[in-house]
Amino acid sequence: MPSPYDGKRTVTQLVNELEKAEKLSGRGRAYRRVCDLSHSNKKVISWKFNEWDYGKNTITLPCNARGLFISDDTTNPVIVARGYDKFFNVGEVNFTKWNWIEENCTGPYDVTIKANGCIIFISGLEDGTLVVCSKHSTGPRADVDRNHAEAGEKQLLRQLAAMNINRSDFARMLYTHNVTAVAEYCDDSFEEHILEYPLEKAGLYLHGVNVNKAEFETWDMKDVSQMASKYGFRCVQCITSNTLEDLKKFLDNCSATGSFEGQEIEGFVIRCHLKSTEKPFFFKYKFEEPYLMYRQWREVTKDYISNKSRVFKFRKHKFITNKYLDFAIPILESSPKICENYLKGFGVIELRNKFLQSYGMSGLEILNHEKVAELELKNAIDYDKVDERTKFLIFPISVIGCGKTTTSQTLVNLFPDSWGHIQNDDITGKDKSQLMKKSLELLSKKEIKCVIVDRNNHQFRERKQLFEWLNELKEDYLVYDTNIKVIGVSFAPYDKLSEIRDITLQRVIKRGNNHQSIKWDELGEKKVVGIMNGFLKRYQPVNLDKSPDNMFDLMIELDFGQADSSLTNAKQILNEIHKAYPILVPEIPKDDEIETAFRRSLDYKPTVRKIVGKGNNNQQKTPKLIKPTYISAKIENYDEIIELVKRCIASDAELTEKFKHLLASGKVQKELHITLGHVMSSREKEAKKLWKSYCNRYTDQITEYNNNRIENAQGSGNNQNTQVKTTDKLNFRLEKLCWDEKIIAIVVELSKDKDGCIIDENNEKIKGLCCQNKIPHITLCKLESGVKAVYSNVLCEKVESAEVDENIKVVKLDNSKEFVGSVYLNF
């Protein structure tokens, strides 16, 4: 073992950098959690970063440790416990690709078996206090049902007692060397993972000893093994490869079987050094199988217990997973207790092993068994294979007047027995997914090979929605191994939008009222032009490098012309499908057949009417377009937030008792939200501009709400929901609880990005959309019957401006977790 540490321990500069990072609103932000030590009146601060901030060239973190505990001492802060610098799987980031490793790293390469449990950090204070931490916490916790740090400490004390070692002596040894012992606690009686650790294999597996410095420094594996032997830890096996070539051969051989020396393992951790600095460099090599299969069995079991459904959407291991369910379901049905324990994480491995025993094979044997592999092949979908069983969906990407419906009708007229056409404008109910449900219902018919899902789909979110519906609903209508190819047809080249606007406007004028929703005579020129301009303004052209457009199996990009463009479009679509999928279009119809089908499509008359906006004075007036009263982010983690409030006020007996009473009496709001904008607050210039931006963003949802409202008024008998969910999200953190005699509110922290705080379905900021309230907040409870929710603004602004009197209670909340709210329109 190395000599005792005699270097500098104070890390004032690191703490300053962490505190600066704590104030960031976006990338690289640090989060603190103050922890009470179990055997001392001292505290430590746990620091962490978002997982996705590690390993980024564009983000420099103050420290790359995953697991960092610093003494709560403003004068002489020291690192109490430290985990490894975050390391990545082979190929996961640029600096774990083999060519980078070859150029920048040097051996020997120490390869240790990756233990499969929960990580535990063990260190000591100068006075002999033993400190045991989980990844991000230590000490007593009331917010979890399993305390990993406490469980790890109990196991440590058992092993020290067995070696007749005093805990304080062990703690002082760690302090003297200024190190953290890093171990994996593996014990199925405490918590099951994927690999099995029965009683005879349970314990703390020591796999590293890190020096408590900001810069990563760790002991060699021979020194780690010495400490493990001396203090009763279980040792992790270490194999050394002197060259990278030897290492890759070793890993390839083990990967072929998913095991090492006949034992199932999750993978390896490889330790080497950087050529340029001789600093330690870690990376990992994880096996996909059989752990993917085991995890899959765990997920389908949980899903069955929760939903009583054995339908699953995993693409691999379909045959053997169905065999597993055949075995497991009768056992689950026979015992609610087994189900209850399974959802808590117990009995997972036992049920898996019972199945393997009944099947007569191990997991590795199943994967390597030729007969089962053949059955897997037979039962799996070959997504690259196209044959007579393959079905097709066509998604147009268009704006109004581009001829998608005429083109679609032409194609269906050519193949009336095998092609179908479902129009979004023919679907009048509130359930948008009826478009996909009706399309799949039609596609499920034996004779139907292709269905055109006719909607404009002019934005990414609409295309994404179609793919999500398809994934969610497919197996409700079709056999699970039906291969569906999705063809995109783009009708509107982005570089011709100006020309498209002029031509499509003339087409809409010419067709007059021959459309379900855009009726020229009723809506008038101004309204129709406004609707069409809105579509063009929001149009997002196809981008095959970006989700969801990269999910299309084939994209047909049409040109745009003046005369008979639908006829030309139909011919191009037929030609391109014939080339890509001759099974669908074996022969291209003759020109006169296509022209006949085209002329028939021109006779098409809509049979369903959809109402958009309002008519002019010469027609029967349609109701005024109703806009939202307010726009909010509805909070999805209600129970978690209530529990967090309870924890944070636990030290105040009076508040705790009052809050308990408010919960019991039902006075606490049943749904929580953050108001983003309100129609009554939009009278000032900036607020008015923001409100207009929100309404422009959600034009489609507002129009759809009004369509449904009119249908309900005409006697559908359904009560319309006054809340409309969008696909946008809001991330936030809780800051402080504000409580006076009238109301209880929570001040929240949103992104301070000047561009806005709302994110779309691609996790990108929506420019210009921010919170209208000066102090973003949640109204938690009204204490007086007549008080308006808007009073929360007054209370929160008082607190933020330090105008706090004796009637106002303020409690700082734990803001380590980022919550998510879905943006809703409230009518």
From Swiss-Prot:
Note: tRNA ligase is a relatively rare protein with about 400 copies per yeast cell. Present with 3110 molecules/cell in log phase SD medium.
Annotated active site: 114 (n6-amp-lysine intermediate)
PANTHER family, per database record: TRNA LIGASE
Lineage of the organism: Eukaryota, Fungi, Dikarya, Ascomycota, Saccharomycotina
Protein name in the entry: tRNA ligase
Entry annotated with the keyword ATP-binding: yes
Record field: catalytic activity: ATP + (ribonucleotide)n-3'-hydroxyl + 5'-phospho-(ribonucleotide)m = (ribonucleotide)n+m + AMP + diphosphate
Family according to the record: Belongs to the TRL1 family.
MF-aspect GO terms: 2',3'-cyclic-nucleotide 3'-phosphodiesterase activity; ATP binding; endonuclease activity; GTP-dependent polyribonucleotide 5'-hydroxyl-kinase activity; RNA ligase (ATP) activity
Pfam families (UniProt xref): RNA_lig_T4_1, tRNA_lig_CPD, tRNA_lig_kinase
Domain notes: Has three domains each corresponding to an enzymatic activity, namely in N- to C-terminal order: ligase, kinase and cyclic phosphodiesterase (CPDase).
GO cellular component terms attached to this protein's record: cytoplasm; nuclear inner membrane; nucleus
Organism: Saccharomyces cerevisiae (strain ATCC 204508 / S288c)
EC annotation from Swiss-Prot or TrEMBL: 6.5.1.3
GO BP term, example: positive regulation of translation in response to stress
Task of the protein: One of the two proteins required for the splicing of precursor tRNA molecules containing introns. The ligation activity requires three enzymatic activities: phosphorylation of the 5' terminus of the 3' half-tRNA in the presence of ATP, opening of the 2'3'-cyclic phosphodiester bond of the 5' half-tRNA leaving a 2'-phosphomonoester and ligation of the two tRNA halves in an ATP-dependent reaction.
Record keywords, A-Z: ATP-binding, Endonuclease, Hydrolase, Kinase, Ligase, Multifunctional enzyme, Nuclease, Nucleotide-binding, Transferase, tRNA processing
